[in-house]
Amino acid sequence: METFLFLFEMLGTIAFAASGAVLGVRKGLDVFGVCILGLTTACGGGMVRDVLLGNTPPAAFQNPTASAVAVVTSLIMFLSGVRHLLMGNQRRYDLFMLLMDSAGFGIFTVMGVRVAWNCVEAPSLYLLVFVGVLTGVGGGLLRDVMAGDMPYIFVKHIYACASLVGAVICGVLRQPAGEMTAMLVGAAAVFAIRCLSAHYRWNLPHPNA
């Protein structure tokens, strides 16, 4: 189980770091800025979660592995060949961002549920879902603010709602189905909802619609 959790978290870290770094490249940041944006996207949600739950210092400071993986991923995204591959085609860029963001989003949502479950005795479903959603959206929220964009969770494709559904699924399935199954199903649900909402342009009601 520990190996699964480590690999699962690293996959989410790579996905979120890649989405942050590529956005930094698109915004014309230098290599330091790209790394900071990738690192913040990958670790920001977990830091906010840990502070909320009283787990200080946050896990990212206790074990630098995730931070190192995020920085290495960001440097790879900054390579000339990768930049030209993604920046030269808008559809390719959009698809890459959707897949990376959705994967990281789903993984960190259920990781947040797991951490909350292990930190609090007999946690309520509300707490599990709240912490899961906060962990999932936190990194992307910080990424968008630092990049000077309107946070994606407020304007596009039922972003936070996907995290909400995945967190509920993970929290409900944990006891009857087991931790691993609950996390996989919850993360898959978030990923699927995000991709489907982007493809079919599902959005919440908007005043300018």
PLM region spans:
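Ordered, amphipathic secondary-structure segments that act as subunit-interaction surfaces
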Residues: 70-114
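Loop-to-transmembrane alpha-helix initiation sites
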Residues: 62-68, 124, 155-163, 177-187
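The first (N-terminal) embedded transmembrane alpha-helix
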Residues: 6-19, 34-40
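Structural signature of hydrophobic alpha-helical transmembrane segments
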Residues: 1-13, 59-72, 123-136
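Short, structured motif recognition centered on aromatic/hydrophobic residues
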Residues: 36-40, 47-53, 130, 134, ...
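Small-residue-rich segments of transmembrane alpha-helices in multi-pass membrane proteins
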Residues: 38-46, 96-112, 132-134, 158-171
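C-terminal ends of transmembrane helices
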Residues: 17-27, 50, 76-93, 141-151, ...
